[in-house]
Design a protein with these regions (language model features):
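Contiguous segments within soluble domain cores/interaction surfaces
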Residues: 1-115
Length: 115
């Protein structure tokens, strides 16, 4: 299974990741998108977290979820799908994590000048 498109991860943002598959996604019965960094599974998104459109699976991350990633070390991402009894995995993708100058949700830090 080949994943064609992937966006980057920046901490405290709300990215949407797109996975283009070589088949229609309608038949997918199980799905896990695993985000792995520094020898730990950081986040798993499931089928209920995703949107399907023809051959594309998309998943959005929240500010809280991207805050879980460390600014040091790439994140590895793998898509695993099940269609009935069949199981498939994508290649492991590596994306760079971009840091922020000030930690915190935007709504918490945008109230004026920070000390």
């Amino acid at each position: 299974m080949e994943v064609v498109k992937m966006s980057l991860i920046s901490r405290y943002t709300t990215p949407t990741h797109f996975f283009t598959l070589p088949f229609c996604t309608d038949g997918i019965t199980e799905l896990a998108i695993i985000y792995y960094q520094n020898d730990n599974v950081v986040l798993i998104k499931n089928l209920s977290d995703c949107t399907r459109n023809d051959t594309v699976i998309s998943v959005s991350l929240t500010e809280e979820e991207t805050a879980l990633f460390k600014p040091q070390g790439d994140v590895k991402i793998q898509l695993r799908v099940g269609i009935g009894e069949k199981r498939m995995n994508s290649k492991v993708l590596r994306v760079t994590v971009y840091d922020v100058l000030k930690d915190g949700l935007l709504s918490e830090i945008s109230g004026g000048d920070a000390p």
